[in-house]
């Protein structure tokens, strides 16, 4: 017996993710995003998201060491390394997409 999800379970998980993405895309203001994420996530999850985003922004500035970034963001060195890896090497490039988009907006 294996713990491998069935194709039906995998399809449902994919459908659920798409539904979540559509819900996020429907939000129009910071207040709406705050209300939705506050309902969806625990306070700890929101803090973790905000911490990783702070780390990504600091890494993008390339002005501090990983240790300094960890201290400034209140993150663990492991979190800094993980975010740095996603920022540089991962195929999704979600951090990079948003960082670049926000730079052009400023």
Protein language model regions, located:
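Intrinsically disordered, low-complexity basic tails/linkers immediately adjacent to helix-turn-helix/homeobox/MYB/SANT
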Residues: 93, 97-106
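Short alpha-helix boundary/capping elements
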Residues: 32, 44-45, 60-63, 88
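Short alpha-helical "recognition helix" segments of helix-turn-helix
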Residues: 68-74
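Helix-turn-helix DNA-binding helix
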Residues: 79-80
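Short, amphipathic alpha-helical "recognition" segments used to contact nucleic acids or chromatin
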Residues: 49-64
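Short, Lys/Arg-enriched anionic-surface-contact patches
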Residues: 33-52
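DNA major-groove recognition helix of helix-turn-helix
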Residues: 84-87, 91
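General nucleic-acid-binding
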Residues: 1-27
């Amino acid at each position: 017996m294996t713990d491998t999800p069935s194709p039906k379970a995998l399809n449902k998980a994919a459908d659920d993710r798409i539904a979540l993405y559509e819900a996020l895309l429907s939000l129009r203001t910071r207040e709406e995003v705050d209300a939705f994420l506050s309902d969806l996530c625990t306070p700890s999850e929101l803090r973790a998201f905000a911490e990783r985003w702070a780390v990504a922004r600091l890494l993008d500035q390339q002005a501090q060491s990983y240790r300094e970034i960890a201290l400034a963001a209140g993150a663990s060195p492991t979190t800094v390394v993980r975010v740095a890896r996603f920022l540089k090497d991962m195929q999704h490039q979600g951090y990079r997409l948003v960082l670049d988009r926000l730079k052009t907006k400023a």
